[in-house]
Amino acid sequence: MENFMRIDSKESYENAVATLNAWAKAYYDDDAPIASDEEYDALYHEVLAYEQVNPAQKSLFSPTTRIGGGVSEGFSKARHIKQMWSMEDIFSQLELVAWLKRGEKQNLSFVAEPKFDGASLNLLYEKGMLVRAITRGDGITGEEVTQNARVIKSIPLNISYDGRIEIRGEVVIKKADFDAINEERTRNGETLLSNPRNAAAGSLRQLDSAVTAKRKLLFIPWGVGEQNLGLAKHSEVMKFVRDLGFYRDDFFKILDADGLAGAYNELLKQRDEKDVMMDGMVIRVDDLARCEELGYTVKFPKFMVAFKFPAIEKTTRLLDVALQVGRSGVVTPVGVLDEVVIDGARVKSATLHNFDEIERLGVMKNDLISIIRSGDVIPKITSVFKERRDGTQTPIIRPKFCPECGSHLLDEGVFIKCQNLNCRARVINSIIHYASKKCLNIDGLGEAIINLLYEKGLISRVIDIYSLKFEDLMALEGFKDKKAQNLLDAIEASKGASLARFITGLGCEHIGEVAAKKIAQNFGEGWLEADFDEVKNLEGFGEEMANSLMDFIEVNKDEILALQSIVRPSFERKQITQNAFSGKSVVITGTLSRPRDEIKAELEGYGAKVVGSVSKKTDFVLAGSNAGSKLQKAVELGVRVIDEGEFERLKLEI
């Protein structure tokens, strides 16, 4: 992250306060951030540190004295009965220890639960009925969005409690639902939503509640405001709230101070698997009387804190755009970044997908941008901070010539393609794909070796790897007897690979591992003779996939037959006896004793369809430890849940 502001004087302090207020307005009020969370947090803490050293200079407008944002003119104002406080953020174990020492909290009992990344909402119930819903706003006053709250299915319109109670929580969008929304917006030619948090906030504040209803928002309760329950502990209050019919997350722990670090690390490991975006863990003193004793600062409760996760979204600068040519000839733009570290990984590049995406983002070279990285997925650009341009930016031009071979490119709109079948990049990437683990799995034949073999004129197409000789390899730099023989042995071992792997390795557009497996299972050695209708009618296929395969076979049939005669791929038509899993839909979740891919392959061998999400159509959920929300949904829907022990018992019946 660039160091955009150094606070070493009253003037630089006031500039920093103004910058933070502008960023906060964009984030809270406009739902259009112009800085990343990490960038805001870093500058916020610099301002706070300056104020602690120079209290007399503290501005009345400093964000360290305020909570959240203001109120949009599109909604009427409404006051919370009890103030909705923000939480203090901490970012390390040392800060956690310091927080525990303040107020002598070391020997207390705590509740630990996820900090979901969404939009806070306060629900007021009177005599069992939902009467008002208010956004956080500035903590005192928010926007009344009652009509929109009523169309969120996870918010009960009535509850079995007659008293007056404010139930607070986070409005979020599940990752899968967010992706589905953007897919639909892409089809409709609409601007894509930048991330689930902004999507949730924007959806909650729609003037048309019909739009809110379509967004599949989820309300996750995390506390109460006004209440007369007479309960002694926060954990008891939350059990009461969830028993009223509100969403119940599976991570909710009551523990002492010694267990907090372990709980944080456990939750951090679930970050990518969770259905909903999390950005930390909330730690709260469980004893409500002790909470009252600890009290509040001007902004934060002293009895709770947000232990933030390492940022997966950061601000950096787009230095350039590199062009990559794939095996199908598609030219893909890749953003070259000023290096940043995200969750321990050094990030120098980000996907830009295609040139239509560049135009949609409106991004230029040397722009400040926000990037997000999740798991091992290639980072992507989520925001462009156009308001912070300084005149050094230059436009990104659609290419007309292949960056590898110089051929004139075919511009089809979304895709720009090199049509030269002998283009170096196309050839090399085709061979890399063929030799990869998910295809023919030729150990030792990686990108560097393939490039070397190509440069020396030893290979120019996939089939050439089967003509390599010992003396060819020994003539190359870095090869000795053992390395050369090992590579030849690995190439020989690829012969007889499964037909599904062979088809995957050919690299036909739209035909991946799953599709190749279905082609092999249904057509066997006659797969090249399958007609359009037969392919189109396979489960999960359609006209686009069938056309792609037919066109690929028509152009490359002679080459495929020659390669197939050397590899002689094996195949086995599916002969599945009736069993507990045949024809069933199965979801795998949690940590299991064997790799998930291994169990998935075994289930598919029994005729099961392994899917990624739980629905009413799911027949089994195979759950390991730390199973998460998929297990919870299975229980709610009445789907049969089995553990590994029951899985093994059911297999014995096959």
Curated annotation (Swiss-Prot):
EC number per UniProt: 6.5.1.2
Amino acids binding NAD(+): D37, E38, E39, Y40, D41, S86, M87, E113, R136, E170, K308
Domain BRCT, chain residue ranges per copy: 576-654
Active-site residues per Swiss-Prot or TrEMBL entry: K115 (n6-amp-lysine intermediate)
One function term, GO molecular function aspect: metal ion binding
UniProt keywords, alphabetically: DNA damage, DNA repair, DNA replication, Ligase, Magnesium, Manganese, Metal-binding, NAD, Zinc
Cofactor needs: Mg(2+); Mn(2+)
Residues annotated to bind Zn(2+): C402, C405, C418, C423
HAMAP family, A to Z: DNA_ligase_A
Family: Belongs to the NAD-dependent DNA ligase family. LigA subfamily.
Function summary: DNA ligase that catalyzes the formation of phosphodiester linkages between 5'-phosphoryl and 3'-hydroxyl groups in double-stranded DNA using NAD as a coenzyme and as the energy source for the reaction. It is essential for DNA replication and repair of damaged DNA.
Protein name (record): DNA ligase
Organism in which the protein naturally occurs: Campylobacter curvus (strain 525.92)
Gene: ligA
